[in-house]
Amino acid sequence: MKKSILFFFLSFTVLVNSQTEAIKYNNIQTDFFFGRPIEHDKKLKDAIDGNSYGILLSFNKINTKNTNFNKLYNYPERGFSFLYQNFNSDVLGEVFGGYRHYNYNLKNTSSSSLKLISGFGFGYVTKSYNAITNPNNHALGSKLLASAYLKLQFFQLLKKEKLSINTGVSLIHFSNIALKNPNLGINTVNLNVGFNYLLEPIKFQPLQEEITTNELDKKVYFNLILRGGYNESLEIDSGIFPFYTVTFYANKTINKFSDITFGTDYFKSEFLKNHIKNKNLEEGKTYNENDYARVGIFVGHELIQNNFSFVSQIGYTVYYPFPYVSRVYERFGLKYKLGKHLFSEVTMKINLFRAEALEIGLGYKF
């Protein structure tokens, strides 16, 4: 999952060819996919019975506003998509998903339509963990889930006036972000075949002005973010507790697409206090129940999307009084500029493959 997400962010750095056509089309696409869930934890062995399959229906609307953003990203499409997936497993069942997605045109030729599609939304699974009726489902602890997908579309089998058949690969992720355990999550790698139909043509005049690097503000800025939310420990039915995170970091713009970041996190997760207490009682440990704060340092990247940015970070916990999953952590999510100084964030903190928390944050840029 992490490698696929990192590939997603790095792929955007090759978007340098500008769109010169003056006609675009809204379109709909139906993808049929077939794949295999990834057994990233041995506890998933009894849940994964075989290959999964499903259908993804997408409604795509072209963005023709003459802005620097659209010119930089080759006039991307955006829209809504709906998914049905059958895990072909009595443990995992079926899942339905709804997403807001973005399509980025990496390359367009007569025989190739290289696109990168990212979708973020929610899912509903028919079978979740139950201690009595479904004890082997360590992937999904609740029926309501967070979900995301990445799709790389790279080859056209057929292209007519309005109809085309496209192939590609995709990665689909479901989890409940540690709001209810167990929560190993489920990731599926798929092969896709998509049928695309063009709707009404849209004529527009592409922006011709070039953007030079001299226009970029490459100063180093400092940022302070307060994050919070609720989550549960690894212990099933141990209850949800609030958590708080204070982040201070520096950022610098390096090109038209990217900022790099470096900073530190202070984590205060109330569930750890209860978790440490239980471990001391059950295993005879002597950890200090009141010493459960953690401190980490991280480096990161922000992919600039107008007022939005895609955030990716990898960090290491330097103050670690109690061992919990992993010292290494990752953070992925969205950042939105509210003004010159204020911004908001919605991010997912992950310890290796295991989601720890969905973070809601408010930040200030100095």
Regions from the PLM with identified roles:
Residues 1-30, 114-116, 163, 195-199, ...:
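Bacterial Sec-dependent N-terminal signal peptides
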Residues 19-67, 206-251, 365:
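Short glycine/proline- and aromatic-enriched beta-strand/turn motifs that initiate or cap beta-hairpins
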Residues 24, 49-55, 74, 92-98, ...:
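Residues that define the transmembrane beta-barrel architecture of outer-membrane proteins
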Residues 28-36, 82-84, 116-124, 167-173, ...:
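Transmembrane beta-barrel strands of outer-membrane/channel proteins
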Residues 30, 57-61, 100-104, 118-122, ...:
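Residues on the lipid-exposed face of transmembrane beta-strands in outer-membrane beta-barrel proteins
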Residues 37, 187-207, 355-366:
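Outer-membrane beta-barrel "beta-signal"
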Residues 40-45, 91-94, 128-135, 177-184, ...:
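Outer-membrane beta-barrel translocator domains and adjoining extracellular loop/strand segments
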Residues 66-69, 110-114, 158-165, 201-204, ...:
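Repeated loop/turn-to-beta-strand initiation elements of outer-membrane beta-barrel proteins
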